[in-house]
């Protein structure tokens, strides 16, 4: 990585945020390592630019290059802002999850369509504060168009019995400790499908930044609700299944990228659906007399030229 250029002039509209089990893009050649700074600090890792068949994709390691950042320490605002600043408009995020449903087996994949927030306010979770207020819609936290692309690519996975579930509700907990048994049963009663520590505020910030965002989840365990000896989740169990099914994770993400890079998906990749959604929410809230200059600069970083139009 030391010998890679630190600038890249070509368009980069798609990014992959890798979590536990996905640390690189197979078949892609690294061509640059960018180190942008944002008003919210530096991202978790350099933004690695990879090329494949003439197209560029950015890759960011959510927990750092050496997995040194706990879930509540991930600089999610810097991550999302840095990706947008280089031109990214679509994010495919990957996460290992615990299953809260019998039918979602370890090594199965899930395309979630909903989230329940069980974080505790420790993580900074909005771009719009400190003198500029914006209330952004989040009823459907993931991008339905991206979800359809992921589902279409299910055939890229290899092996008997590998299943891709086309919807589900993520419980996003604070961590870093796993759930108690009582909590796990409670989450099941709420209709939770899987549980992780990474979906928020990442998905919410992507929406505030007008990015198309979809998480791909791979189940590694049954959390601790099954009440059977030896089945309670621990790190060794998570890593065991990630190692066993890591190739399928890479195959699936690779197939999704190939599909997104087709011309037919250009509007989807450019997040045309979300353009103006957050800016409108900001524009009509805080009156000019109450706007803090520093907060205005932060919004300008996300949307250059914003205040000239508003």
Curated annotation (Swiss-Prot):
Q: Which Pfam families match?
A: PNP_UDP_1
Superkingdom per UniProt: Eukaryota
Which keywords appear in this protein's UniProt record, sorted alphabetically?
Cytoplasm, Glycosyltransferase, Nucleus, Purine salvage, Transferase
Catalytic activities = S-methyl-5'-thioadenosine + phosphate = 5-(methylsulfanyl)-alpha-D-ribose 1-phosphate + adenine
- Please name the pathway: Amino-acid biosynthesis; L-methionine biosynthesis via salvage pathway; S-methyl-5-thio-alpha-D-ribose 1-phosphate from S-methyl-5'-thioadenosine (phosphorylase route): step 1/1
Q: Any idea of its EC number?
A: 2.4.2.28
Q: Name its cellular compartments.
A: Cytoplasm; Nucleus
Q: Which PROSITE patterns match?
A: PNP_MTAP_2
Under SUPFAM superfamilies, the record lists:
Purine and uridine phosphorylases
Q: Describe the family membership recorded for this protein in Swiss-Prot or TrEMBL.
A: Belongs to the PNP/MTAP phosphorylase family. MTAP subfamily.
The record describes the protein's role as: Catalyzes the reversible phosphorylation of S-methyl-5'-thioadenosine (MTA) to adenine and 5-methylthioribose-1-phosphate. Involved in the breakdown of MTA, a major by-product of polyamine biosynthesis. Responsible for the first step in the methionine salvage pathway after MTA has been generated from S-adenosylmethionine. Has broad substrate specificity with 6-aminopurine nucleosides as preferred substrates.
Question: Which NCBIfam families does the UniProt entry name for this protein?
Answer: MTAP (TIGR01694)
**Name this protein carries in UniProt:** S-methyl-5'-thioadenosine phosphorylase
